[in-house]
């Protein structure tokens, strides 16, 4: 009997030892770990989305301050760039040497419309006639140039007013900066053209003096041809 009891006890010991060596699986712990992992993944995804939104906002802010809005030429009238001729001296010299024949374009049209009598038609001497014609054409030419300058300045001021209205319509900082740049450019062009017009007027005054001097010389030449007495200064010249 004692042997049987000892054998049964040994069998229980062996069985217990065998069971102790098998791994134990905790389903609750695995589920919790998986839930924690999924929660971390969701947080990572949210952080990535936030970073993406921040990047998009920064990009929008950057684009708002940089880039080209294409407003550099908005409302720009290219005809305002060349309303005053660059060859003033050539035009004056052409009028002085050609008289009516040198009048062209708007100058010729205005001359035809405004002239009610030709004071030079009865002058037989060619030089005297051309000098007379030059004095007739000169103020007409000045009138055309001054009118062009006035019209161009008026158009530029209208452009500036329109550009200011465009600024009030937009909230884009870069667009506003471009429009302000255009306004500054138009103001600079007005100042430049005003300087050119001032120089033109000075040249016109000098040209008037040259025409007067030429007429005096032609009169003196004609008087000398006719045997009329001349001033001593002119006698020395001839």
From Swiss-Prot:
Protein name (Swiss-Prot/TrEMBL): Type IV secretion system protein virB5
Keyword Transit peptide tagged: no
Organism per entry: Brucella abortus biovar 1 (strain 9-941)
Family: Belongs to the virb5 family.
Keywords tagged on the record: Signal, Virulence
Signal peptide interval: 1-20
Location of the region described as Disordered in the Swiss-Prot/TrEMBL record: 219-238
Keyword Glycoprotein recorded: no
């Amino acid at each position: 009997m004692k042997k049987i009891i000892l054998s049964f006890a040994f069998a229980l010991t062996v069985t217990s030892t065998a069971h102790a060596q098998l791994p134990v699986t905790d389903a609750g712990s695995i589920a919790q770990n998986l839930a924690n992992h999924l929660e971390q993944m969701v947080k990572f995804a949210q952080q990535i989305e936030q970073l993406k939104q921040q990047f998009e906002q920064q990009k929008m802010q950057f684009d708002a301050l940089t880039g080209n809005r294409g407003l550099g030429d908005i409302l720009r009238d290219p005809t305002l760039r060349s309303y005053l001729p660059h060859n003033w001296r050539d035009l004056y010299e052409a009028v002085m040497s050609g008289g009516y024949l040198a009048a062209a374009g708007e100058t010729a049209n205005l001359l035809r419309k405004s002239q009610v009598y030709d004071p030079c038609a009865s002058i037989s001497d060619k030089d005297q006639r051309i000098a007379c014609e030059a004095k007739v054409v000169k103020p007409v030419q000045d009138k055309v140039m001054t009118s062009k300058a006035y019209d161009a300045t008026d158009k530029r001021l209208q452009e500036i007013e329109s550009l200011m209205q465009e600024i009030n319509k937009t909230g884009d900082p870069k667009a506003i900066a471009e429009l302000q740049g255009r306004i500054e450019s138009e103001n600079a062009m007005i100042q430049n053209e005003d300087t050119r017009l001032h120089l033109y007027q000075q040249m016109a005054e000098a040209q008037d003096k040259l025409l007067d001097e030429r007429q005096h010389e032609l009169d003196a030449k004609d008087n000398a041809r006719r045997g009329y007495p001349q001033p001593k200064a002119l006698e020395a010249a001839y």
